[in-house]
Structure formats: C-alpha cells, structure tokens
Amino acid sequence: MNGDPAENRARLYLWWSRLAAMTAKELIQFGRDTLLLVAIAYLFVFDTYMAGNVSMQLNHAVVVVHDADHSAASRELIYHFRPPHFRLGGEVQDHRAGQRLLDQGQALVVLDIPPHFERDILQGKPTDVQVQVDASNTVLGFLASSYAAQIIGQYGFDQALARLGVTERSMQNVPMIRDEHRVWYNPNQKDAWFMPIVELLIVITIMAIMLPAAAAVREKERGTIEQLLVSPLTPIQILLPKVIAMTLVILLGTAVSLFFVLHGIFDVPMKGSLALFFAVTTLYTFTTAGLGLYIATLSRNLAQAAMLAILVLMPMIFLSGAWTPPEAMPAGMREAMFLSPLYHFIEMGYGILLKGAGLDVLWDSLLSLVLLGIVIFSFGVWRFKRQFG
C-alpha cells in the first residue's frame, strides 16, 4: 500500500473487519442448518466410535467338521479349534454339506479329517487334513488359513515328538532359538487404536472438501453470490470466510472426537504435541478446502457438488495408505500416493498421536503437505476468482 500510513491502517482495518464479519456470517448460517449440524456430530462422534469397534482380527470364526475317523486323535485336533479365534459350528456328514455351508456363508472354515487318521499317526505314516476356507473376505480368509495351518502344524509336531519319545524335560536340553520381540506404539495391537484414528482423519478430509464446496454452491443456488460480487467485497473476502469458518467447525469436531471418543472411550494415547496436531490439521484443512472451492466452481447445485466430491475423495482415500499399506501397492501407485494430501496427513497423525514424534521426524511429510497445499489452495482460489472475480 502507498500513501498516508494512517489511511493504509484504516484500509487494513476495514479489510480485516469485513473478513471477520463475513466469517461470523458463515458461522451463523452454519448454526442455523440443523441437518448439517446433526451430520457433522454423527461423523465426528458416532462414526469414529463405530470405527473403533471394528476389528480386523479373527474372532469366533465358525468351523464345521467332517470327521471321518471319530477317534481320540481327531477329537483332540478338533478341540484345538476353540475361542477366541474359532468356534465349533457343528459336524457335517460329507464334503458336499461342508461346501454348501461355505457357499451360504454359514461357515468360514471346513475341517476334513480323513478315515484312519489316528491309525496312521500311531503307525508313523503321513496323513493329510484338508482345510477349506472361505476367502471371499481376503483378510479373514488369510487369517483363518494361517491360524488353521499353525494349529495343525503344532499338533503334528507334538505327535512327532511323542512318537520319538521326546519329553518336555528332555526338550530343555535341546538348543532352541527363542523369539524375543517387542511391539512398539501399540503393544497390544489394538484395532481400537488404529481404526478410529484413520476414520477421524478421513472424516476431516470429507468435511474439509464438502463444507466449503457446499457453502459456495448454496450461495450460487440462492443467487446471493451475485449480491456479494456487486458489494465492496473482493473475491478473496468472499471465499476466505467460508474456509475459515468451516476450518473452525472442523477443529471443534476434531477436538470432541479426540478427547471424548478416541481418548475417552478407546483410551488412545496422545503421546505427541496436540498443538502440533491441530496446527497440521489446520494446514491440511486449508489444503483440501482448495479442492472444495474448485468443486464449487464446477457445480450448479449441491447434488453435483456431492458427486464431484466423491470422485475426488475416493482416489485420495485409496492412495492414502489408510486401507492398504504402500508396500502392497504396485510401484506406479506407490509413487502416486505422494500426490495424496491424506497420505501425508495420516503419516503425521500417527506420528504425533501414537509415536509422539515431532517436526524433527515429520518435517518431510509436513513439507510435502505445505507444497501440495500451496498448489491446491492457490488453484482453487484462482478458479474461484476467475469465475466470480
């Protein structure tokens, strides 16, 4: 600004007062939208709560048995398929009955014990036990197959030792490699620590895109955007209050979810700096709000904005590492993950909340998010100014 310093201060004061007034207007409008308030409360509270109750572990998977031997050895093997991982769902008379239960989804595992199972073990002959697993759910199928193989393998090992006359006392003189491992950051490997954090960060992403887009599109639908454009307000003074107001709402929802759901209910530790986490969340919200502004310039109504938001959200989530670890993805998709702001946000979220990491560890993720934020938010502002400026 050039000219008299007092005049420049007055202009600056006027600029910021208009920005504050527009932000207050956005917050008031938001507070009057009961349906939107309920939706946000649901996502930040009940959605994260439900995510914390989702388990990726194998618990009480139904096992049905076709026991063609009916011996003490077969009953002993069946006994090992017990809770918490498995539960016995009954016996079937033939292979086809077990296959039907797999087809109908009434069993996850069918254990098929052949005739002469006990006789072959006592005579030292090799014997086969067939395990059929429903792997339509890949994760559960893999876990069930792994646990079943471990149970059968251990049972066979114990039988071999017994046949060789090896006792538990004599085993103490055999050199063994002991597994001494330590699990960091989530010692009990609780899904209730992992799942709600992921869900919270995804909810923040959804809100950061949808709320600014919905606010701008609502102005277009009501025709009030034209009234704002003929006012003394600049396009920046029109769009920034929407982003600032929705960022404040998201930060409030995040705080409620963190303190009352994640920490209060699921006892998720908050080892790092909460100030750093909220600062990163603010930066991330502005970054993804740029996508919301871009969506608003392409949409004529809220339905179009919602559809376009889904088109943007799904690649961001798939490329974030929230559902699939980067190591399990093809090389090309691993490279594309660095273009997803959510990927860097999740890295920092886990680092701060579970690991207690600071900027000395997370600086590269923060730098990537800053660079993406500059590009995405600037592009959204440019599109908004081009359409409404």
Positions of PLM-derived features:
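Transmembrane helix segments
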Residues: 42, 48-58, 300-339, 343
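Alpha-helical transmembrane segments and their short interhelical loops
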Residues: 45, 235-309, 314, 359-366, ...
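N-terminal membrane-entry
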Residues: 188-202, 366
